[in-house]
């Protein structure tokens, strides 16, 4: 995932993934359904960093606060079963989308305390 120029205020300077997420994505079989929906979701985020649903601060799982020190958190539904969790980070070149986790619905509910 490459960083690019900022074209509009909704376009991030880049979209990148946490190391663990990047390893997971690179392990997926070319042409697999999961890889297709992840790439489609990343394409949407490249055009609009606010495409996901903003998660209220009081609902942030401690996991993300402790591991990443996040002060904003978004959920993007890749399909009816798969969630992409991301944050926005200010960088010299603008605002970057950083993908923190890709979760199936069950893991998402566990992470956010719904299950």
Task: Report residues per predicted region.
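Short, intrinsically disordered low-complexity segments
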Residues: 10, 45, 53-56, 82
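A short, surface-exposed loop/turn module that caps and links secondary-structure elements
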Residues: 47-76
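Enriched for short, Lys/Arg-rich terminal
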Residues: 1-9, 26-28, 67-115
């Amino acid at each position: 995932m490459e960083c690019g120029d900022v074209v509009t205020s909704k376009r991030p300077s880049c979209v990148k993934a946490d190391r663990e997420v990047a390893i997971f994505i690179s392990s997926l079989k070319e042409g697999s359904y999961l890889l297709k929906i992840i790439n489609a979701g990343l394409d949407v985020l490249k055009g609009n960093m606010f495409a996901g649903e903003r998660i209220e601060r009081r609902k942030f799982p401690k996991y993300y606060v402790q591991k990443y020190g996040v002060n904003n958190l978004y959920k993007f539904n890749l399909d009816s079963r798969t969630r992409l969790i991301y944050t926005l980070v200010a960088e010299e070149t603008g605002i970057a989308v950083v993908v923190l986790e890709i979760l199936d619905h069950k893991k998402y509910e566990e992470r956010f305390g719904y299950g």
